[in-house]
Amino acid sequence: AGPSPDRYLWGNAAFALAACITAAFAKYGWTAAIRGYEGGGAVENLNVYKYRQTNGETVALCPTEVSITDRREKELSDLGFIALIYRKNSDKAAFFSGQTVHKPPVYTSDTANANARISARLPYLLNASRFAHYVKANMRDKVGSFMTADNVSKYLNNWISQYVLLSDDAGDDIKARYPLREARVDVSEDPGNPGAYKCVIFLRPHFQLEELTASIRLVAELPPPAV
């Protein structure tokens, strides 16, 4: 039997996730790169306590209070929980899930369902919130000017275009700095409020790998590749 977990001071994994978010922001200026060992979600240099069992074998105590399997992590993610997953025989762990507690509504349209699922994922939600905050803060400085709806639309579209990367083949670091694949800002006048405008921002991020379903087939002759 190993040492009792009650003898150690455990910390909330939320602080580790917050550290990943702040590290991504400090490096890229955005907070999408917070998942996976290679995607910014790694937690390194964990304290690994090693002890000797009665049979003489040296065993490392898991630095996370609970060792969560991949299957259990997927179940927790589907319920809106982000788990810290320990990599065995190392001093590292990582966050793989980006799901929030918001349950996406189900629609009859595949496009609407896809948009709802994206809106429930933390990396995209953090970036979208930052864009919304900047638009409100920036346009507040324009209050009192003589900008028309077209002027505001051109101004915001020119601004947001600097964060759009059209290439799907760019590296992860480049996509982290330019988090949008497409973007558009629509500005219209508020008929009942002269001088007031309504703004709708459409954001299409660079999608992150969520899961991969693999199948294995044993054949005597390789078939032609699927088109």
For every predicted segment, state its role:
Residues 184-227:
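C-terminal edge-of-domain segments
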Residues 84, 93-95, 135, 183-187, ...:
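Generic structural hydrophobic/aromatic packing signal, biased to beta-strands
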Residues 90, 130, 156, 180-182, ...:
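Active-site lining segments that contact anionic ligands and/or coordinate catalytic metals
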Residues 144-148, 161-169, 210:
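Intrinsically disordered or highly flexible coil/loop and linker segments, enriched in small
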Residues 78-82, 168, 195:
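Glycine-centered secondary-structure boundary/capping sites
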Residues 2-155, 211-214:
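Long, contiguous, structured domain-core segments that constitute the functional module of a protein
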Residues 167-190:
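Long, charged, glycine-rich C-terminal linkers/tails
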